[in-house]
Curated annotation (Swiss-Prot):
Catalytic activity, EC: 2.4.1.298
GO molecular function: quercetin 3-O-glucosyltransferase activity; quercetin 7-O-glucosyltransferase activity; UDP-D-glucose:delphinidin 3-O-glucosyl-5-O-caffeoylglucoside -O-beta-D-glucosyltransferase activity
Entry keyword set: Glycosyltransferase, Signal, Transferase
Pathway membership: Pigment biosynthesis; anthocyanin biosynthesis
Signal peptide coordinates: 1-22
Origin: domain of life: Eukaryota
Keyword Transmembrane among record annotations: no
Physiological role: Catalyzes the glucosylation at the O-5 position of anthocyanidin 3-glucosides to form anthocyanidin 3,5-di-O-glucosides using UDP-glucose as sugar donor. Anthocyanidin 3,5-di-O-glucosides are molecules that are responsible for pigmentation. Also acts on anthocyanidin 3-O-(6-O-malonylglucoside). Much less active with hydroxycinnamoylglucose derivatives. No activity in the absence of the 3-O-glucoside group.
Family: Belongs to the UDP-glycosyltransferase family.
SUPFAM superfamilies from the UniProt entry: UDP-Glycosyltransferase/glycogen phosphorylase (SSF53756)
Residues binding an anthocyanidin, per UniProt: 16
Name of the gene this protein is made from: PF3R6
Name of the protein in its database record: Anthocyanidin 3-O-glucoside 5-O-glucosyltransferase 2
Keyword Acyltransferase in record: no
Length: 443
């Protein structure tokens, strides 16, 4: 019997790679071979980190194409040109791959690789979108471009869209906010128009039925299918205890600073974990406020501050700029990278201060960890709304007049979910409930 082969066309960012690789593992277990199609930059980074040491599982192969940015897009680089080159070169590479490999029977693509769907359709290969944000966000975009733009643009704090919870403006995806350049809305519209090119288009969403039951059925034009949570088995159903990593880290974890060993020395539910993902970089003033807030809490913390490189390729560490770095290192631990799931699953973890990227949100739900939400852009603002109001697993910080977060606000929110009061108990009960439901979703 000939095995089927699915091609996963994946945008070269950690937030896209992690769920795509986890989906690939699920396909392999179901007897389907997988070709993972991404850029040379991502492939090289994945191949050079410890997560790749075990090698590829049988049935999984990688195909990398050069987008002209094999060392990645430099800070301050031309993002528009980068995406244009990615589309032109990626389309050509995919076209040639499908032409010369007739064993690919299906293409699943990231929404930032919408061109992959167009190429696949010209080759008469069926497609599905892998949506790596909540179904609610896809619904908001869909309704915005299909009759609800005026209502959303009006700036109301009671925006009611079909089958979705009431939204206020600050909870909309930032692409739809007035201050966002029009070109970003047009880009998203273009992605959805590609999806609309197929009758009853299939959308695979990193969510599960109990988490977003209404959003998954809100768009008649699409078939939304919850396939999540897309996280390694060891932290979810436990069927494969050895599966402790997504297997595609773009950044090397801090081997010299063993996070788990440090966590082992801390009491249960005592540690504050702080991480704002692989892309976001706060200005120095905001980092200082976060540091002040952590010190004011007086609780042990683990803070992931990613190393940055300047235009000359030299490493810069934000922690070195902090005026309170000495005090911070006495009270907590600062690392440049760590295995987030290992941290979230550790008994010492008490709460997660996060930017609310969707992968981080799904991981915190699956591990039963309360959240302090500090959303910045894209879907993060909507994710924070869902965490606080729909699922009740955390609290969202209040921004100051300058759009930042004061240290005292960080302290206030951390204490709300950790001080043992009524709010703490409610948030923890909800976190455990969703942890249980996430595991049941795999049944």
């Amino acid at each position: 019997m000939v095995r089927r082969r699915v091609l996963l066309a994946t945008f070269p960012a950690q937030g896209h790679i992690n769920p795509a690789l986890q989906f690939a593992k699920r396909l392999l277990k179901a007897g389907t071979d997988v070709t993972f199609f991404t850029s040379v930059y991502a492939w090289r980074r994945m191949a050079n980190t410890a997560s790749a040491a075990a090698g590829n599982p049988p049935g999984l192969d990688f195909v990398a194409f050069s987008d002209g940015y094999d060392d990645g897009l430099k800070p301050g680089g031309d993002g528009k040109r980068y995406m244009s080159e990615m589309k032109a070169r990626g389309s050509e590479a995919l076209r040639n791959l499908l032409l010369n490999n007739d064993d690919v029977t299906f293409v699943v693509y990231s929404h930032l690789f919408a061109w992959a769907a167009e190429v696949a359709r010209l080759s008469h290969v069926p497609t599905a979108l892998l949506w790596v944000e909540p179904a609610t966000v896809l619904c908001i975009y869909h309704f915005y471009f299909n009759g609800y733009a005026d209502e959303i643009d009006a700036g109301s704090n009671e925006i009611q869209l079909p089958r979705l919870p009431s939204l206020e403006q600050r909870s909309l995806p930032t692409f739809l906010l007035p201050a966002t350049p029009e070109r970003f809305r047009l880009m998203m519209k273009e992605k959805l128009e590609t999806l609309d090119g197929e009758e009853k288009a299939k959308v695979l969403v990193n969510t599960f039925d109990a988490l977003e039951p209404d959003a998954l059925t809100a768009i008649d034009r699409y078939e939304l299918i919850g396939i999540g949570p897309l996280i390694p088995s060891a932290f979810l159903d436990g069927e494969d205890p050895s599966e402790t990593s997504y297997g595609g880290d773009l950044f090397e974890k801090s081997e010299e600073n063993n996070c788990v060993e440090w966590l082992n020395s801390k009491p249960k539910s005592s540690v504050v974990y702080v991480s704002f993902g692989s892309v976001l970089r706060f200005p120095k003033a905001q980092m200082e406020e976060i540091g002040k807030g952590l010190l004011a809490c007086g609780r042990p913390f683990l803070w992931m501050i990613r190393e940055q490189k300047n235009d000359d390729g030299e490493e810069e560490e934000e922690e070195e700029e902090l005026s309170c770095i000495g005090e911070l290192k006495k009270m907590g631990k600062i690392v440049s990278w760590c295995s987030q799931l290992e941290v979230l699953a550790h008994p010492a973890l008490g709460c997660f201060v996060t930017h609310c990227g969707w992968n981080s949100a799904v991981e915190s739900l699956s591990c039963g960890i309360p959240v302090v939400a500090v959303p910045q852009w894209f879907d993060q603002t909507t994710n924070a709304k869902l965490i606080e109001d729909a699922w009740g697993t955390g609290v969202r910080v209040r921004m100051n007049e300058g759009g930042g977060v004061d240290g005292c606000e960080i302290e206030r929110c951390v204490e709300m979910v950790m001080d043992g009061g009524d709010k703490t108990k409610l948030v923890r009960e909800n976190a455990i409930k969703w942890k249980t439901l996430a595991r049941q979703a795999m049944g």
